[in-house]
Each structure stands twice: as structure tokens, then as C-alpha cells.
Amino acid sequence: MKSLVSFGNGKVELLEVVPPIIEPDEMLIAPILTGVCGTDLEIIYSKIDPAYVVYPVTIGHEWCGRVVQVGSPATEIRVGDRVVVEGIIPCGHCYECLAGSTNRCITYAEIGFTRPGAASELIKVPSALVHKVLDSVSNESATLVEPASVVTQGILKAAPKVGAKILVIGDGTIALLAARLVRNWKPSTVHMLGMKEGQLQLASAAGVEEFFTNTPQGKYDLIIEASGASSRISESIRQLVRGGTLLLLGFPGSDVMTPLSIDDVVNADLSILASFGYSRSAWKATVALLNSGELDLTFLVTHRFALEKFAEAIHALESAPAPRGKIAFEIGQ
């Protein structure tokens, strides 16, 4: 079978590899659509913290697929079902896992980082992490469950009030998902501070009412920072109402420092929250939104490539003009 393997330092190859053999507690799945994102670029170019990846690694952590083989028949999932799979594989025994914070598992593994990902014709996964998606859910929406769950985790933590005025900073996939998902909390306003005017079309589809490329006037109850731009983080402190919340989802870089006016934070009684990954509960909540029909993310996949065209996909990820949403590999059916 073919797998897209990263060796780090810019080296990535489409290789013929031996198909995986599953254990009784695993399933074999044929990926249908696999997204690629900025984190995959960091893996390819070795810009990610080496503690989070094991080379060589088959990339691909945003995906949906169809079940080919089930290790144990004692499951609701059947061969032929279309599924999504939690990427974080928790140990299930540490104090974080026992508390339900599986995103903070002490010894977790992760699909596409420390074990083979879904930019491949076949992938084996733990059966306990597999979730069926209904026929009404598009492949595009299903593929975005992973990044959407990252956003769900953060929004659940921030707990915006009904009628809140919200600003999303950034115009990439995470920012667009944040704008769309936060709508389920019934805010009065969702604005976006982006970098490219060409992203306006996607922002509007996500439910954004006003799109800015320069710092907007006025103040917000909740600001979701999804750009990773350190300068935006500093500016956002002064854009919050007293008692407001700043939610950090973006990554400026492991060696990037961000200056903050602590006096402004304390005097305004602000809350600064960070959110990493997703827990099992956030994943289940996101899948439930899709299966219920309350969430449709089809609009976000804008570029598709065959796995053999991986070089073109990587180039598009680095430099495709706006509007640009999710870039994905079409692998199976």
C-alpha cells in the first residue's frame, strides 16, 4: 500500500509499505479524505517540538475513512461503516485520563505524530476510538472533526454566555472553525480579525458578520486567538471588556515570547485561558453536532489532491492564494 512518509528536514516521500496487521482491539480503515495543515508542515520541516513526533512518520491526523476489518466483532462498528477516529490515544490510567482530561494524558500516543497517520491507503487504529458518522454527514465535514474538536475543547473551557460579543483572531482553518462552532453558544456578534481580505467569503460562510484586516474598534466579551501571531495577543488584552476572556488556540512558536501588560490584565479582571488538543468528551460532542445536522463544515474544504500529487498539495498549503480553506488528499471512497 502507499503511504506518505515524512523523514523530517523537508524530506517526504510516497512509499510502498507493508499493510498493517490488526490486533483484536483494533480496526483496519481505508482513509477516504485526509486533510493537511500547518502542523503537518512543521512535521515535514522538523519545526515541531521533537517530543511530539517520532520519525519517520506517515502524516495525516485530520481524516475520515471506511472500516475494512474489525479485530473483534463485539462492537457497534461494522465493516463498511464510515467513521472518524480520535487521534489522541490516551493511556487511560494516569490521573489526567481518570479525571477525563485525556488531552493532557502523561504518556499519550497520537495518530500522524508518534504512530502512522492517514495519508495512506490503510491505517490501523484502536477500536475504542472509532466513531460512526451518519450518511447525512459529508466526507468534508467528517474530515474536519479533529480540528473542530480542538476548537470545541477551547470553547467549552471558555464557556461563552448567551448574547456574548465575540472576536476571532485569524482566518485559517482553526479560526474559521471557531467562528462557526461558537455560533452554537448563541452569541450576539461574531467578528473576525484576519490577515487576508480574500478569506472574507469563507468567513461569511462560517457565520462571521464583520471581517476586519485592521484592529476593530469596540470591546468584546470573548476573544479567541487562533492566528498564533504574538502581536495580536498583546493587542487583544485592550479589546476585552472588564471581566472578559482571552482564549488562546494558536501557536506563535516554541521560542517566541509575547509581552503582556499584566497591570491591564489585573485591573480589568481578565481571564486568559489556553486550550490544548481535545478530550474524548470534546470529540464526542463534535461528532454529535455533525450527526444531528447542527453542524456542516463542507464549505471549508477548498482544495483536493490525489495522494500522488502530494508535492502540489504541500505547495498549496504554503502559498495558495485566498480564499483557501482546508487542503485534503482524496484517497478512497
Predicted features along the sequence, with ranges:
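NAD(P)H dinucleotide-binding glycine-rich loop of Rossmann-like/cofactor-binding domains
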Residues: 91-169
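A short acidic, Gly/Pro-enriched loop at the edge of an enzyme's catalytic core
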Residues: 216-223
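Glycine-rich phosphate-binding loop and adjacent beta-alpha segment
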Residues: 230-292, 330-333
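C-terminal hydrophobic helical "lid"/dimerization subdomain
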Residues: 1, 280-333
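Glycine-rich beta-strand-centered segment in the early N-terminal region that forms part
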Residues: 20-34, 48-95, 134-136
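Mid-domain Rossmann-like dinucleotide-binding core that forms the NAD(H)/NADP(H) cofactor-binding site
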Residues: 137-213
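N-terminal Rossmann-fold cofactor-binding loop
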Residues: 193-196, 226, 276
